[in-house]
């Protein structure tokens, strides 16, 4: 792809659907290559909007609003960064010649756990936890009885761990169903019931489909709390056999989804047995560690790939870790304190996302640190993150 000049005739325009912290880093990397960036989200002053050329505040599940903005901006590429989008409309746009990253089908399938699980397990034959889908409480009771407890209950459409729970006793079925419905995104009333896997560890394998083939980043270990990313580190130590199988599964599912871009493939590993979990066709929360761990961050890799540019060699610079900085209260605006102490941690870097307000558990920043090994890096990242405090503006 030949690239134009921003704000001039012939500019290469990227429309970001979703403007959070991941979208912000994508916008920055795109602008480094002279791309004109338009950021879209449901609320004003979202992180990517603060660095984009223009922005729009709309519901991305409203196809008329999407149609209006796309018609106004006439982007070369539509780059979804979140799940809360009318993906059926993206399919129609793609059929009409609009380029959606990586493909509209990939975006549509992966926002729905039923679609991606059926693709991975039933079409591609990838090993997964035992599972079933239920569209009613009574149907869920039957599947829980078959799969057994403990099991994991998730809405088929949700993000950041919303609506997910571990069902440890059949008496909790009603509560798990209610929690799933409260956390579900969109109009779906279906859940997935999964066998509870006693895995040794879980990884994200960042997989890049680009003009010269498929490339892999070193595996990323991570910890989730209530289904949401809390810390990650790279590289995650794996046996050669487990890594080879992880790459095989990641390449299979990303090839089936198609298109160019970076995918976050989540996998469970137990005694070198690798089980497919989920895939996101975009930069991944756990991949924020690559801003310090690699020569090319996941965001630069994504931008290069979607623009049809070579990716080159991906190099791990040092054992590294990331740790989230979370709000613990609701404020309209905050100031950050403790930054001096945070940045006294050896090799540390901070990314404060610039979100306009806080609520308990909202991710407001991330600490990034290197170490002599991942254990040291994880300890440093935690110390750096925990030094940062948020206080309301008086």
UniProtKB/Swiss-Prot annotation:
This is Formate-dependent phosphoribosylglycinamide formyltransferase. ATP binds at residues 113, 154, 159-164, 194-197, 202. GO terms for molecular function: ATP binding; magnesium ion binding; phosphoribosylglycinamide formyltransferase 2 activity; phosphoribosylglycinamide formyltransferase activity. Belongs to the PurK/PurT family. Keywords: ATP-binding, Ligase, Magnesium, Metal-binding, Nucleotide-binding, Purine biosynthesis. GO terms for cellular component: cytosol. GO terms for biological process: 'de novo' IMP biosynthetic process. It catalyses: N(1)-(5-phospho-beta-D-ribosyl)glycinamide + formate + ATP = N(2)-formyl-N(1)-(5-phospho-beta-D-ribosyl)glycinamide + ADP + phosphate + H(+). InterPro entries: ATP-grasp (IPR011761), ATP-grasp_carboxylate-amine (IPR003135), ATP_grasp_subdomain_1 (IPR013815), PreATP-grasp_dom_sf (IPR016185), PurT (IPR005862), PurT/PurK_preATP-grasp (IPR054350), PurT_C (IPR048740), Rudment_hybrid_motif (IPR011054). Involved in the de novo purine biosynthesis. Catalyzes the transfer of formate to 5-phospho-ribosyl-glycinamide (GAR), producing 5-phospho-ribosyl-N-formylglycinamide (FGAR). Formate is provided by PurU via hydrolysis of 10-formyl-tetrahydrofolate. PANTHER family: FORMATE-DEPENDENT PHOSPHORIBOSYLGLYCINAMIDE FORMYLTRANSFERASE (PTHR43055:SF1). The keyword Transferase does not apply. It is an enzyme of class 6 (ligase). Its EC number is 6.3.1.21. Residues 118-307 form the ATP-grasp domain. Mg(2+) binds at residues 266, 278. Pathway: Purine metabolism; IMP biosynthesis via de novo pathway; N(2)-formyl-N(1)-(5-phospho-D-ribosyl)glycinamide from N(1)-(5-phospho-D-ribosyl)glycinamide (formate route): step 1/1. PROSITE patterns: ATP_GRASP (PS50975). It comes from Pelobacter propionicus (strain DSM 2379 / NBRC 103807 / OttBd1). N(1)-(5-phospho-beta-D-ribosyl)glycinamide binds at residues 21-22, 81, 285, 355, 362-363. Homodimer. The keyword Metal-binding applies.
């Amino acid at each position: 792809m030949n690239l134009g000049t921003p704000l001039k005739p012939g500019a290469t325009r990227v429309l970001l659907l979703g403007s959070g912290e991941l979208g912000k880093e994508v916008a920055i990397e795109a602008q480094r290559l002279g791309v004109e960036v338009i950021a879209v989200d449901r609320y004003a002053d979202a992180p990517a909007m603060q660095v984009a050329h223009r922005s729009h505040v709309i519901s991305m599940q409203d196809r008329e609003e999407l149609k209006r903005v796309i018609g106004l901006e006439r982007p070369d590429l539509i780059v979804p960064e979140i799940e809360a989008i009318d993906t059926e409309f993206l399919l129609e746009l793609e059929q009409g010649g609009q380029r959606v990253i990586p493909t509209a089908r990939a975006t549509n399938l992966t926002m729905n756990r039923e679609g991606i699980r059926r693709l991975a397990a039933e079409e591609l034959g990838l090993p997964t936890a035992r599972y079933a889908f239920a569209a009613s409480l009574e149907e869920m009771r039957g599947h829980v009885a078959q799969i057994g407890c403990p099991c994991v209950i998730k809405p088929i459409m949700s993000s950041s761990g919303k609506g997910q729970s571990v069902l440890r006793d059949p008496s909790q079925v009603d509560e798990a169903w209610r929690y799933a419905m409260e956390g579900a995104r969109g109009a779906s009333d279906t859940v997935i019931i999964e066998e509870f896997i006693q895995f040794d560890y879980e990884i994200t394998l960042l997989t890049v489909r680009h003009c010269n083939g498929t490339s892999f980043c070193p595996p990323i270990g991570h910890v989730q709390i209530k289904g949401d990313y809390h810390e990650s580190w790279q590289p995650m130590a794996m046996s050669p056999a487990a890594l080879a199988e992880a790459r095989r599964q990641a390449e299979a599912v990303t090839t089936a989804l198609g298109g160019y871009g970076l995918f976050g493939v989540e996998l469970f590993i137990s005694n070198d047995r690798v089980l497919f979990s989920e895939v996101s066709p975009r930069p991944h929360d756990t991949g924020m560690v690559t801003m310090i761990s690699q020569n090319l961050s996941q965001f630069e890799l994504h931008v290069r790939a979607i623009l049809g540019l070579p990716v080159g060699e991906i190099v791990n610079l040092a054992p590294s870790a990331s740790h989230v900085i979370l709000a613990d209260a609701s404020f309209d605006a905050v100031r950050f304190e403790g930054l001096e102490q945070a940045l006294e941690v050896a090799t540390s870097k901070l990314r404060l996302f610039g979100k306009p307000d806080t609520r308990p558990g909202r991710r407001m920043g991330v600490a990034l640190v290197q170490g002599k090994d991942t254990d040291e890096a994880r300890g440093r990242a935690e110390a750096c993150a925990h030094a940062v405090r948020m206080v309301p503006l008086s």
